[in-house]
Amino acid sequence: MPTDGKLLDSSETHEVVHPASAPSRFSAVETILLAQGRRLFSWLSVGWAIGALLYFFPPYEPGWRLAALIFGIGAALLATTWSRLRFRALAFTLLTLSGGFLDAELSAHRLPPMPALPSRAVILHAHINRIDILPPRHGETPGRRLILQNAVFETGIDIGMPPLRRLLRVRLREDDTTPLQAGQEIRLRALFRQPSWPSLPGGRDPQREAWFANIAGNGYALGPATALSPPTRQSLEKLREHVAVTISQTLSGQRAAIAATLLAGESSGIDPRTRQDFAASGLAHLLAVAGLHLGLVMAFVIVFLRAALAAWPYAALRWPCREIAALGGFGIGIDYVLLTGAHLPAVRSLGMAALATLALMTGRHVLSMRSLALIGLAILIVAPASVLDISFQMSFAAVMALIAGYEALRERLLDLRGEGGFLRLLISHITALALTSLLAGAATLPVSVAHFGNLQPWFVLANLLAVPLAAIWVMPSGVCALLLMPFHLAAPFLILMGWGIGVIITLAHAVAMLPYAENPVPAMPGWGLTLYLLALCVLCLWKGPPRLFALAPMALALIAPWLAAKPIVLVSPDAGLMAVRDQNHLELGPFGSLEDETRDEWVKALALPISSLLAHPGCTETACPVEHNGRKILLRLRDRQDGRLLPSEEACRHAVLFVSASPAHGACPGAAVIDRFSVWRDGAYAVFATRQGLNLVSDRSTRGARLWVPKIGSHGMPNLPLAQEE
């Protein structure tokens, strides 16, 4: 039995100490900790994530002093009580929780403040940081969105000012065909706005996302872009374009579009119907290059190289074939990530692949909880806000479930493989692929439901078929095609890849047509998602039968969407859209295209079909009375008089709440009021019914005074000149 001093050592070979056999000198807590062995190391990243999450909870900007004090106490406790196991575990708990909190606070405060953006159309020049290809809208041609850095506005007050320290996102016009590449300096006329307020209290927070993404605002071009300098990075773009052109010369339609996505990161050719089918069937992840694709590419290359080296007697006897294959697979993986655009999920997966390659080179376990914890801890230290990111949550939930699942089923899988005959090998590999889809899909389904508000019950069936097809047919053919393109021999493998893609497209369409393929689910409250992820960590990381107790909080988290209170009235951040919820519908007032995103967020949050509020008896744009449990609410949906014409005394009689798209100007005395000035100050509103009356909840009251929440009346920090040197 190893000594307790090795509790948080990185070694995995650890004899489990059962409570019955633990020495009497250990307390009950120490006995439990000893039984976990070195698996406790994996909890360091969990503690860091919880600490980072604690920074985002308060409705105010928390100070750093208390967390720093706790960190100091943890460090002192670790230094003075290292020989006592329970105190050492407590010290690491304090260190990780406070460390994650301090890291998140430092990450938030080191970013530049939100700048004030011009309120009118402006000409600017900037450098292109990145170009995103956007899917077509309503059958139009694919769009382009530029991520601009070092932007300088050509306005009177901005002359001589330093460039913006944050990035700008701007969508180009559909008819702008100017060839642009990352690194170029451009001149452009555009209209910008700051990051949007949340569409409803407690909903998705675009302002927080923009703060940590270093984004200053979004805009759209009013004219064509003019290139002021040649591109500085051409080789990858040209190579990506060459791959896409070669694919289009061999394949056609959606097969060519998906092949270009998988091999060159060019997703603009995928039409809305295909995207909808893949989303409804739970296969949308196949259209976004990430860890799955990288893993399939590297696995194919490693298996091929190792088999080829083993078939050569000289190499098999003298060379480290496994290590050579691992390095070759990792090298191809790097090339693949760069070729497909180096998107953040793929880059994150490449870091995990680097650790897996290192494990192969040193004879360690390729996938272990320790390596997953190290990668997670590294990502959280660099970007603690990742704890709120869906890609981070889904990636680590999936990998953690895979490692735990394969650990639990290892003996049965070995029995299935037997002596290694061809048929048994084939069955074991297919079973492993199916098990991978099942474990990863089951672990990430609640996370997907929490973020997207959609339950796809047939996703398991679709992934059980599609992922093995992608692993043994589509991606190997694609890798062979890429390697043979310089020799003009890629066509046969592209055709083979196209056949496999065609099968997956047919499968996605068939599953999307099944009954109940898509089921809207109400928004999961934050505590529900947090509870689920913590319960999943306990289920996967804890050793022994007590981990099954995590199933109870996990079940509670899964029903959380139906336990949370639902608003009866919603008001958008600009009061341009209002909605009333009844039992079966979300009744919407009149709105324009600018409110489409808000409408979609409301529908996703409440999981109800929409209908027109104007169809309500006695409802007009200027006076729309509705009742809820005997309480009268008066809505003014539109007002061309800008509030100058007050509602009649009859309309206001017995009203307990007056909601107006224009200034209320003292209308309906005695009633609570939400008007245009209310949302200007506090953002979107949600009205909840309680036994005592109506509870008015604003976005500002929910988020509080945080760095990314604009102060009342604030338009951002003016772009001031730098101080002159002495």
Regions found by a protein language model. Give the residues of each.
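Membrane-interface amphipathic/re-entrant loop segments adjacent to transmembrane helices
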Residues: 163-164, 225-234, 276, 280, ...
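Non-globular, low-confidence helical/coil segments that flank catalytic cores
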Residues: 176-178, 182-185, 189, 209, ...
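Divalent metal-coordination and catalytic microenvironments
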Residues: 51, 126, 190, 262, ...
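Alpha-helical transmembrane segments of polytopic membrane proteins
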Residues: 64-73, 394-395, 463-469, 526
